[in-house]
Amino acid sequence: MNECIVIKCGGSMLERLDSTFFHCIEKLKRKYRIVIVHGGGPDIDKILKKLQIPIEKKHGLRVTSQEVMEVVQMVLCGSTNKNLVQNFQRYGLPAIGISGCDGKLLQAKPLNKKIGYVGEVSKVESSLLEGVLNLNYIPIIAPIGIGEEQVYNINADIAAAGIAAALRVKELIFITDVDGLLYEGKLVKKTDEIEILDMIEKEIITGGMIPKVQAALVALRMGIQSVSIVNGTKNFIGLTGEWIGTTVTRGRLQYE
């Protein structure tokens, strides 16, 4: 049986995924069983603005009232998820769209009451995913979690890391709009969590790259062996199957 990998697509990337991305997925499908986790921030913001519901974020997380939660669930589990499923199938990639609520796939508990109905993964029903994967489908997951009495908005990075850990995958891939981490103008092909923390402290890593590498560090601490940050608008698979981007591991490496 092929190894499994988890791929996280940020909400800001979904409308930019074109034939290049899907051809990469086609290549990966020959070697791996694939799980996709997606975000949907821009789509959610668009509906919130139309409904004149305030948008508030703290430390990169969406403050989620009951009113906001209803919109988040409607958008992520509805049009955002189904549009992505349609795009996969348009390229001949068999896909099934599901939310974390379905079959209690993503069980969640509240992260911090100050930010409302935002959750963290407490358990993943991995047998459900294994069943879908064994049927040769690509599960495309909307990161909504289910608690004892409430559904929760789960950050897509954290959901992807939780799913990757539950499936015991070796690799987690973050699809972004940048080539990876740059150091002195050159792409850092391989690095590790110690070097990442050092580069943040020295302000080598700044701006929008910080949350990307922080998400990678969280995933590594959950037991994933390596996390790669790649550019979804370009071919991100090398001739020998390596990732074209930045791969972060738990071991000690030197800059490459």
UniProtKB/Swiss-Prot annotation:
Keywords, in A-Z order: Amino-acid biosynthesis, Arginine biosynthesis, ATP-binding, Cytoplasm, Kinase, Nucleotide-binding, Transferase
Enzyme nomenclature, EC number: 2.7.2.8
Annotated positions for site Transition state stabilizer: 8, 212
Keyword Nucleotide-binding assigned: yes
Swiss-Prot/TrEMBL catalytic activity: N-acetyl-L-glutamate + ATP = N-acetyl-L-glutamyl 5-phosphate + ADP
Family (UniProt): Belongs to the acetylglutamate kinase family. ArgB subfamily.
Protein name: Acetylglutamate kinase
Naturally occurring in which organism (per UniProt): Bacillus cytotoxicus (strain DSM 22905 / CIP 110041 / 391-98 / NVH 391-98)
